[in-house]
Amino acid sequence: MGNIDRPRRLHKVVITAPTAMPNSEQVRLRQLARDAYSLMCKDGVQRNPIDVCPAPESIEAQPIYNINGWRDWSYDEATACQLVYLFAEVQERYGGDARSLFDLRGKPRVDMAGKGFDGNVLTIGSIDVGAGTTDLMICSYGINAIGRVTPVPLFWDSFYLAGDDIMRSIVQNLILDGGARGDIKSGTISSVLQARLKTMTNEQFEQRLNNTNIESQRIDIVNILRASSDESRAVAIENYGYDLMFDYFGGDTANNSDKDRRCRVDFNSQISVPIASYMLQLFSDNRAQRDISFNDVFAKHKPAKYLLDHFRNHFGFSFEDIIWEYRPEKLAKEIRKIMTPLMEQLSILLHAFDVDIVMLAGRPTKLPALTDLFLKFYPVSPDRLIRLPEYEVGNWYPFSHGTGEITDQKTIVAVGAYIGYLASHGGGIRGFNLDMSYLAKEMGVTANYIGKYIPRNHRVDPTMFTPTNPTVNLHIDSFPFIFGCKQLDTPVYESRPLYVMEWIGQGNAPMDLTVMISRSFQDNKEKLIIEDAYDRQGGNHKSNIRLREQSLVDSQSGDGNCWLDNGSFKYLKK
């Protein structure tokens, strides 16, 4: 793919993005990269000029009626994954003859024939499950009049349900909470805590009473000491255990000091996530069930001592003593619980577009439970299902084993973008040429329907803005108000957050506020504008309200705080 004798100089930086990332964020991402390079050049050191691709101005949203406007391909991640597969198949298995591949694996399509692509075309449906988003791209590939392979997008979208959500579910239910074995060493933090509390004497509880100034915990301990029966004592102990868990993992409260908050965040990144990652790696490797010790997970990199001390001081026992249960069936259950609604929805879309090849990409697709879940809803013959984590891409790939398998899944998007750029500029790669004009022209934003966003189930309800309804008079009784968007107007379609509307005026917002909001579906369907805002007495409050772009909303807290950043789990409330 290159000349080893030629000095390497960086001339161009290609930046990819999730397939349906809001257009304003896509533009800003590339502009920030350009600004970063400009800032670096202020040190006076002579450097080669570097271009950012795609250029921010080349991917800005354009009015639907501007048919002559030029746009670049957005270098979306799902299409980049498809290009790795397509290039490998054409070059490694079909001797550079894309037509042979299309004739063997594809079929004629009426929608492609209408664009001038006669004969067989290959339609690939790819699901790229990343950490933060799951990207869908359904794309047909034909050969144009001058022999270039031409991708034509049929359907695309991004869903904010992915690997991080699987990780959170495992941390919540297999590491922090869940389980009631009654074992003082084996289980989850909650189950081990409850088992240990049940063995404590009144003298030990009295000592804890003297060592805590948290009122809720003091009340729990007093109830334990005053319990008139074994049953009431058991209930009081259970409540005390809940409060200990909530005060440590449940989010910011008046009981938390600054040290408590920092330790909760660090516990998440240094302890909880590494244990969950260790379990997922065992699951990916099809390991049998086993128990996991502290030294199994942290053999090389142990958590900071202050974290372990803080845990011991709060809960009364050493974290290092816990034995974790790795049970493959439990991990599979968590994966199914999180991903079933989305996999079912994606399967319907793949079936509707009658794809020839189904591709699963991203590290989570190495998990057998995720593939099994997909096949439950979309049965497909083995030769039509491509799992990129196991695909023999060939030795040309920069990050491959000697057998041609990809060693690092995170490189797939980068290599796919590299192929997309080189094959569509100049002379292509080894005779492999791409015409990206349809991708650039037709891949627009997907926010067809906008309405009130419900974080807990990723839904928009009710739908307010439609292609034919450009203006909404919204009655607001509380702030913030979150807007979400979706491509299809069906009740179960996965939606994503887009804006948050906030009160920025002095004092409290009026209880009954009417806000007039508009958007132009033809000009920029993602852009909302506040036209007017007034209260029941007719007072104008337009200047006191702000629409702020916000594409990340936590499904538990309902705000922009991510569990990976703050380590809190709202479900721990009683």
Segments (PLM) and residue ranges:
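Terminal low-complexity/disordered tails
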Residues: 330, 334-353, 366-369, 448-574
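Phosphate/ATP-binding catalytic cores across multiple sugar-kinase/actin-like superfamilies
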Residues: 1-5, 82-115, 309-355, 370-373
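Conserved phosphate-binding loops in N-terminal lobes of ATP-dependent enzymes
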Residues: 1-24, 30-34, 574
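Hydrophobic, small-residue-rich alpha-helical packing segments that form membrane-like cores
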Residues: 3, 19, 30-120
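Glycine-rich phosphate-binding/hydrolytic loop that grips phosphoryl groups
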Residues: 58, 62, 66, 70-91, ...
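Phosphate-binding glycine-rich/basic clefts of nucleotide- and phosphate-handling proteins
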Residues: 19, 138-313, 420, 426-503, ...
